[in-house]
Regions:
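Membrane-embedded alpha-helical segments of integral membrane proteins
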Residues: 81-105, 109-174
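N-terminal secretory signal peptides and thylakoid transit peptides that target proteins
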Residues: 209-231
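Intrinsically disordered, low-complexity terminal tails and inter-domain linkers enriched
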Residues: 8-9, 163-215
């Protein structure tokens, strides 16, 4: 009697090709991201693992990296927004690389790929749990993300391996083939070679070891449909999570409160001659859509005014809890203020002016009773971002520090802090201009360190006397002869006394100033210059109302603002 060996012992176990293994892994990672985002949209948008990791990068990144990010530019995006897109895309690229590696190592052992899914998922869970706004329910999204990734990885890997094995699960094929050959040998001896119970090569339409049950083999089309379903589901889940996360109808909330933002202490009307827009300067009031935006928020916190509340606590005699209605019921102020970002380079455009409506922050602090020794007003935003403001500055009677609810006659735009933000004239935004305000604590500098202070920036950051050249622009070619130069200057709380310009290092020439609106706003300047043909360099400098001349010493933005004379090069023909 001859011996028939099982054919499975003659063949190597099926193995995924590298492209198939990578595709399986990438789709599984996409499913994990999508499901995590979807569940976060239902439970709490900040608990999306993808966003939480990005937030953690912002939270723990060194100052140099943050400044590099803010300096990035992308077509169609203003400065201060390209860094957010770049970070999110960068995290996506890193995830893609990890997914590719996980796919390749899973060719030998599928469980190794799943372990990578778990490790990445646990990293996302850690990012969620270390968020300053963490709540226990936030763990649901990262756990769902891990579960979805594991399921998708195992399911797709099994299907791809089945196809590689000829359409039937590898284990079943090997077991069935063995029994079929042995049964065929026994059948040869007993009934002429037919075995009704163990189909072999003669009956490929039935599953190996199927016990008489028929099944269709897996085809490439089946696998592609399964992969497409996972991919489309991942994208759909991600989009769904985004839409659910934006579920707060901010526009409806803004429309509801708009009629009530009516200042009882209005600012003066802007006088004629307050700008030289005809000569190339900005308009005096910056439209809301053009107002500069610099912040760390990857996803803007959205909250309806009816749901907003804030606590003033810490080193105070009486803790205050305020709703949006409480603010509206207080005397409303209206102040025109020029705001400046500390990241503004010499000659930069991170400066804007608006009419802000709100309540006196000083009055609230006096009502709470700030205790002696409280040196810092520590403010926190809805997304956990923190700012430290010198308490003595906020309490100055003439400073007009405000909790702002309106901007240029409208409710605050969402991207500029709706429902409530802080504005303290004369201080750079990083120590004063908390958006999406959620909490105020009177404390000391030793007790609390804000986001920027931990990165080596200054506690005290009054805005420096600076100027900018708006016309001509860098690289312009103008007609030789009488050339109009124009620009802006600012020294908030001190005001601008004069601006001078010089051509090619020559004598300083005084410029004509626009009408002053108040000491907290910029002033425009314009001057006629006699410019011969050739290449030229133009510089400007300002003097504030205290007589302090703008410094020529060059300084970077860190730790308390850039300085130096603005300079542009142009040609005349």
């Amino acid at each position: 009697m001859s011996t028939v060996l099982p054919r499975s012992s003659e063949q190597a176990p099926p193995r995924l090709s590298a492209p198939a293994a990578v595709a399986v892994s990438v789709l599984a990672f996409a499913a994990a991201v999508g499901v995590g985002h979807l569940v976060a949209g239902i439970v709490a948008p900040p608990s999306s693992p993808y966003q939480a990791v990005a937030d953690a990068v912002v939270r723990y990144a060194p100052s140099e990296l943050v400044e590099f990010g803010k300096s990035l530019s992308l077509p169609g995006l203003p400065r201060g927004q390209a860094d957010k897109v770049g970070l999110l895309v960068g995290i996506g690229v890193v995830l893609l690389v990890i997914a590719i590696v996980a796919g390749l190592i899973s060719r030998e052992h599928e469980r190794l790929g799943r372990r990578v899914v778990v490790m990445v998922g646990l990293f996302g869970l850690a990012a969620v749990c270390t968020s300053p706004v963490f709540a226990l329910a936030d763990v649901v999204a990262p756990l769902a993300s891990i579960g979805a990734g594991l399921w998708a990885f195992r399911w797709l890997h099994h299907k791809a391996l089945t196809l590689a094995a000829g359409g039937f699960p590898p284990g079943a094929q090997r077991a069935g083939s063995g029994r079929g050959d042995a049964g065929r040998a026994a059948g040869d001896a007993e009934d002429g070679g037919h075995s009704a119970e163990s189909p072999g090569e003669d009956d490929p339409g039935r599953p190996p070891g199927g016990g008489g049950h028929s099944a269709e083999p897996l085809t490439r089309r089946n696998l592609l449909v399964s992969g497409a379903a996972v991919g489309v589901g991942a994208v759909g889940a991600g989009v769904g999570g985004y839409l659910l996360g934006a579920g707060v109808d901010v526009a409806a909330s803004q429309a509801q409160v708009a009629p009530e933002i009516k200042p009882r202490s209005p600012a003066r009307l802007i006088p004629s001659g307050a700008d030289f827009a005809f000569a190339g300067t900005p308009t005096f009031i910056t439209p809301n859509k053009d107002f500069y935006r610099i912040d760390t928020a990857l996803r803007i916190p959205a909250q309806a005014a009816a749901d907003w509340s804030m606590r003033i606590h810490g080193m105070v005699n009486r803790e205050l809890r305020l709703s949006f209605r409480d603010l509206l019921d207080r005397p409303m102020l209206d102040r025109v203020v020029t705001m400046t970002c500390v990241s503004n380079e010499v000659g930069g455009n991170l400066i804007s002016t608006a009419r802000f409506s709100g309540v006196s922050l000083r009055d609230l602090l006096v009502e709470a009773g700030v205790q002696p020794g409280a040196s810092q007003l520590y403010s926190t935003s809805l997304d956990g971002f923190s700012v430290g403001t010198p308490m003595d500055v906020v309490l100055e009677p003439d400073r007009d520090a405000m909790l702002v609810v309106g901007m240029n006659g409208e409710p605050l735009p969402l991207e500029h802090g709706y429902p409530v933000r802080m504005v303290v004239p004369g201080l750079y935004g990083f120590v004063s201009a908390t958006k999406w305000l959620a909490d105020l604590e009177a404390t000391t500098w030793d007790a609390r360190q804000s986001y920027w202070l931990r990165r080596g920036w200054a506690r005290q950051a009054p805005i420096k006397t600076e100027s900018r050249i708006d016309q001509p622009r860098e690289g312009d070619t103008v007609t030789a002869g009488q050339v109009t130069a124009a620009g802006i200057a600012w020294a908030q709380t001190r005001g601008i006394r004069g601006v001078e310009v010089r051509l090619d290092g020559g004598e300083w020439q005084p410029a004509r100033l626009s009408t002053e609106v108040n000491k907290d706003t910029w002033r425009m300047w314009v001057v006629k210059l006699s410019v011969p043909p050739g290449k030229h360099t133009l510089q400007a400098r300002a003097t504030d109302d205290t007589g302090q001349l703008q410094t020529a010493a060059h300084a970077r933005p860190i730790p308390d603002g850039a300085s130096g004379y603005p300079s542009i090069s142009f040609a005349a023909t």
